Amino acid sequence: MTINSSNIENPPSKINSRFSKLTDYIWPIKRHEVSKFLFITLLMFCILFIQNLIRALKDSIVTTMIGAETISFLKFWGVMPSAFLMTAIYVKLVNRMKAENIFYLIISIFLAFFALFAYVIFPNHEILHLSPVTVQNLTANLLNLKWFILLLSKWSFSLFYIIAELWPNVVFALLFWQFVNNITTVEESKRFYPLFGLLSQTGIYLAGQFLENLSNINDYVTNKFALQSSFHTLSIQIILTIVLILGIIAIKTFWLLNHKVLDKEHMALLKFKAKKKSMTIAESFQMILSSRHIRLIATLLICYGIAINLVEGPWKAAATKIYKTPTEYAAFIGSYLSYTGVFTILFVVLGSNIVRRLGWFTAAVITPLIVFITGILFFAVNNFEGFAGLIIANFILTDPALIAITIGAIQNVLSKSSKYTLFDSTKEMAYVPLDPEIKIKGKAAADVIGTKLGKSGSAFLQSLVFIILPSASYQSISICLMIIFIITCLTWLWATKELNKEYKNSIKFSQ
């Protein structure tokens, strides 16, 4: 009788153990958790798919039917105060209603508005809005208020933009994550959350593919049902009908989670709470001023917000030269979303290896370098005809406007992909070696000041320029924006270098 040496070296139990480890790595969900994980996954998928569709739609409507310049006004004068108002309403609801009912109420309000917009407001927007003659007379008499008049004259488009912007903050960040964090243990979260991250990027890709094929879907629906609606009205109705269907699925999924999937033990944990004594703006400033480490993290957040917004405005304005209708623009945004999803998954795979093999600084500096290099390329093509001509001579593209749009899209795809992975992870790593009190309070301070100043600060500056110079456009102020962009990115790179020193010192002291 002969004994196979390979069986001695690799007995079945050892092979099974290796296989088990591999399957646990790929699919770390335990058998009794499968239904819970899948229902949470379905809920997240519906919410994120809706989020990507309405984000694309709001930009398509406002950019093509009002003007790209108005986006900065909407972000600062519309979205920011609405977010504060929504937070105040939410705190009131928490004290008066059950967590489950709050979810149903808020989701239902969003869906009711989207249904109203799709089937009542948008088809009749010409009747509901001020006439072009009235708008022209008002802007002639109140030239410095031109952009505010345009937004108010097309109030329903402005309102749709604001409501769509609130969805990710209210429904996804607040309702969804608060629910999931309350029903998920720390041990489960380590296995669930990485898969959630991968899923979210899949949702971006699928939403992008849907929008890219919107014209074909529109043609199919028109021929199938012999509809007489205008092409663009039907496109908007198709998108928002999908939103409504997904919203109903999300509500049903949430109900099943609460009543069929989760046990009583889980449900006892479920109670939405207003955050305990969150830091005021003044307290946040004090915390940032008292710690150089936190000050540098806040600088990174501010610079990211400003840099991205400085490029996005002119890029969207350039896109309207070629994509002149909401349907065309939505398809263009769909293509951009698809690539963002693919590249983010790629960065997720590469990100952990970069940090592990090359260190914190290399991983942290990639995002500002990507934003800086691609942003400079975009502004160069957008502002200097000679540079655009040089690219035309060497590449297939022959239209300067199309070159600017393509480079702007590449800039946005790579910037967002690296931000979602490398920037966010290295920023969170920078808090780890800090003293526990500074870690908690410092993170709250940097998030409040950094995020708010980055997004709203850039929007405020741009809107201020358009108020002072009402005849200005993104094209006419593009060189000024480029100079601010360069200063912002250089500051960002400097802050990353300095934070690396602080990070290393903090690690030494914590050991």
UniProtKB/Swiss-Prot annotation:
Taken from the UniProt entry, a GO cellular component term is:
plasma membrane
Q: Per its UniProt record, what InterPro entries does this chain match?
A: ADP_ATP_car_bac_type (IPR004667), MFS_trans_sf (IPR036259)
**Where is this chain primarily localised?**
membrane
Any idea which GO molecular function terms this record carries? ATP binding; ATP:ADP antiporter activity
Give the family this protein belongs to, as stated in its UniProt record: Belongs to the ADP/ATP translocase tlc family.
Q: What does this protein do?
A: Provides the rickettsial cell with host ATP in exchange for rickettsial ADP. This is an obligate exchange system. This energy acquiring activity is an important component of rickettsial parasitism.
Q: Which PANTHER family match?
A: ADP,ATP CARRIER PROTEIN 1, PTHR31187
Q: What is this protein called?
A: ADP,ATP carrier protein 4
Q: Which organism is it from?
A: Rickettsia felis (strain ATCC VR-1525 / URRWXCal2)
Q: Which gene encodes it?
A: tlcD
